[in-house]
């Protein structure tokens, strides 16, 4: 009985940051909400205009897919950085020295704004890996496809495996990196979700190291289902590359758990999965 009460109290403590964030939104007032909506409108207009222009360039470059990848990265650097600047979000980046070499970059996914961080911070020569439905995301989904990034059909295992094999072939031949969200979807409350196995399969086939990107605070800056962007301090932390040269197929589940545990240790309590705050930070 005592153990049950302790667990209940721990879960309540973990929910406090989310409750506090909701209370803060209520206190923001009409002006701040309208200002946030205005910023979102401005960013949407910028993305709309530039996406159309950049999309035309991509169409002209259809015969040169790898040039499209690099130009797509350049577009992401410019637009991603501009959007974050307009929102006025204070950012701290740690460990950027770990982005100098080819790798599989992975990031937790807790907010709509994460996509702009990934666009902004992905090194030139990085291929994105996402679910096939990304093509239906307005503007960015179409640019993603035109930029020759990879879409995975998760409902069809055979097709997904073939897509990953093609991804490995491309990045090996052209000396490219990969970037993806291993959770496979966006968290509703900012807490880390279980990881899919795709990034481990890619590591096994490519032998590229894995570089974890730890995004902290994005779930408070822009929460799923809202139009309120708040200037909450955000930290982007790159961890040292994790070598995969000696990884073997029979330990896939172990590798997924190991990398997931790396995130649990490095995320704040408000972003850890429920019941995991007893692990070291």
From Swiss-Prot:
<dbReference type="GO" id="GO:0003841">
    <property type="term" value="F:1-acylglycerol-3-phosphate O-acyltransferase activity"/>
</dbReference>
<keyword id="KW-0808">Transferase</keyword>
<keyword id="KW-1208">Phospholipid metabolism</keyword>
<comment type="function">
    <text>Converts lysophosphatidic acid (LPA) into phosphatidic acid by incorporating acyl moiety at the 2 position. This enzyme uses erucoyl-CoA as an acyl donor.</text>
</comment>
<dbReference type="Pfam" id="PF01553">
    <property type="entry name" value="Acyltransferase"/>
</dbReference>
<keyword id="KW-0812">Transmembrane</keyword>
<dbReference type="GO" id="GO:0005783">
    <property type="term" value="C:endoplasmic reticulum"/>
</dbReference>
<keyword id="KW-0443">Lipid metabolism</keyword>
<protein>
    <recommendedName>
        <fullName>1-acyl-sn-glycerol-3-phosphate acyltransferase</fullName>
        <ecNumber>2.3.1.51</ecNumber>
    </recommendedName>
</protein>
<feature type="transmembrane region" description="Helical">
    <location>
        <begin position="110"/>
        <end position="130"/>
    </location>
</feature>
<keyword id="KW-1133">Transmembrane helix</keyword>
<keyword id="KW-0012">Acyltransferase</keyword>
<feature type="transmembrane region" description="Helical">
    <location>
        <begin position="40"/>
        <end position="60"/>
    </location>
</feature>
<keyword id="KW-0444">Lipid biosynthesis</keyword>
<keyword id="KW-0472">Membrane</keyword>
<dbReference type="InterPro" id="IPR004552">
    <property type="entry name" value="AGP_acyltrans"/>
</dbReference>
<feature type="short sequence motif" description="HXXXXD motif">
    <location>
        <begin position="109"/>
        <end position="114"/>
    </location>
</feature>
<dbReference type="InterPro" id="IPR002123">
    <property type="entry name" value="Plipid/glycerol_acylTrfase"/>
</dbReference>
<comment type="similarity">
    <text>Belongs to the 1-acyl-sn-glycerol-3-phosphate acyltransferase family.</text>
</comment>
<comment type="pathway">
    <text>Phospholipid metabolism; CDP-diacylglycerol biosynthesis; CDP-diacylglycerol from sn-glycerol 3-phosphate: step 2/3.</text>
</comment>
<feature type="transmembrane region" description="Helical">
    <location>
        <begin position="71"/>
        <end position="91"/>
    </location>
</feature>
<dbReference type="GO" id="GO:0016020">
    <property type="term" value="C:membrane"/>
</dbReference>
<dbReference type="GO" id="GO:0016024">
    <property type="term" value="P:CDP-diacylglycerol biosynthetic process"/>
</dbReference>
<keyword id="KW-0594">Phospholipid biosynthesis</keyword>
<dbReference type="GO" id="GO:0006654">
    <property type="term" value="P:phosphatidic acid biosynthetic process"/>
</dbReference>
């Amino acid at each position: 009985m005592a153990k049950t009460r302790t667990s209940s109290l721990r879960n309540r403590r973990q929910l406090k940051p989310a409750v506090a964030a909701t209370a803060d939104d209520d206190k923001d007032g009409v002006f701040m909400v309208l200002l946030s909506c205005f910023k979102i409108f401005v960013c949407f207009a910028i993305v709309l205009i530039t996406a159309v222009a950049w999309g035309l360039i991509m169409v002209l470059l259809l015969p040169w897919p790898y040039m499209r990848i690099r130009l797509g990265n350049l577009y992401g650097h410019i637009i991603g950085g501009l959007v974050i600047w307009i929102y006025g979000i204070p950012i701290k980046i740690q460990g950027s020295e770990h982005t100098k070499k080819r790798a599989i970059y992975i990031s937790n996914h807790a907010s709509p704004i994460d996509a702009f961080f990934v666009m902004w911070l992905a090194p030139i020569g990085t291929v994105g890996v996402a679910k096939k439905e990304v093509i239906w995301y307005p503007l960015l989904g179409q640019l993603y496809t035109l930029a020759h990034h990879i879409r995975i059909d998760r409902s069809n295992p055979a097709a997904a495996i073939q897509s990953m094999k093609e991804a490995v072939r491309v990045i090996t031949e052209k000396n490219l990196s990969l970037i993806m969200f291993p959770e496979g979807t966006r968290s509703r409350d900012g807490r880390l979700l279980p990881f899919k196995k795709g990034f481990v399969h890619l590591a096994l086939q490519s032998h590229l190291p894995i570089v974890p990107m730890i995004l902290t605070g994005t779930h408070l800056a822009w929460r799923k289902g809202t139009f309120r962007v708040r200037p909450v301090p955000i930290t982007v932390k790159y961890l040292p590359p994790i070598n995969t040269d000696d990884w073997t197929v029979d330990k896939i589940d172990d590798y997924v758990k190991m990398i997931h545990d790396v995130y649990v240790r490095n995320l704040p309590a408000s972003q850890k999965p429920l019941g995991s705050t007893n692990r070291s930070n």
